[in-house]
């Protein structure tokens, strides 16, 4: 991953790097790799995440169509 440093402004470059890493999911990946996760636990976690995503999407659709109050 690469970030340009303009006018020796390291703080701005660090912010840009953190934003890029956040978007790419690097922090989440590092957190997940802290400890070994058994394949069965990984499958269960991924399935639960998928269910959560589907429910969230359905909730957003319903809200957009005016079926659910905000």
UniProtKB/Swiss-Prot annotation:
MF (Gene Ontology): structural constituent of ribosome
Pfam families the UniProt entry points to: Ribosomal_S21
PROSITE patterns named in the record: RIBOSOMAL_S21
Superkingdom of origin: Bacteria
Entry-linked InterPro entries: Ribosomal_bS21, Ribosomal_bS21_CS, Ribosomal_bS21_sf
Gene3D superfamilies membership: Ribosomal protein S8
Keyword Hydrolase in record: no
Gene Ontology process terms (BP): translation
One GO term describing the cellular component: ribosome
Keywords: Ribonucleoprotein, Ribosomal protein
Family statement: Belongs to the bacterial ribosomal protein bS21 family.
UniProt xrefs under HAMAP family: Ribosomal_bS21 (MF_00358)
Identification of the protein by name: Small ribosomal subunit protein bS21B
Organism of derivation: Rhizobium etli (strain ATCC 51251 / DSM 11541 / JCM 21823 / NBRC 15573 / CFN 42)
Gene: rpsU2
């Amino acid at each position: 991953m690469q970030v340009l440093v303009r006018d020796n402004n390291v703080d701005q470059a660090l912010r840009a790097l953190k934003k890029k890493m956040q978007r790419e999911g690097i922090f989440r990946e590092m957190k997940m790799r802290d400890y070994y996760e058994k394949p069965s636990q990984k499958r269960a976690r991924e399935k639960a995440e998928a269910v959560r995503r589907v429910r969230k999407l359905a909730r957003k659709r319903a809200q957009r169509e005016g079926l659910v109050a905000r």
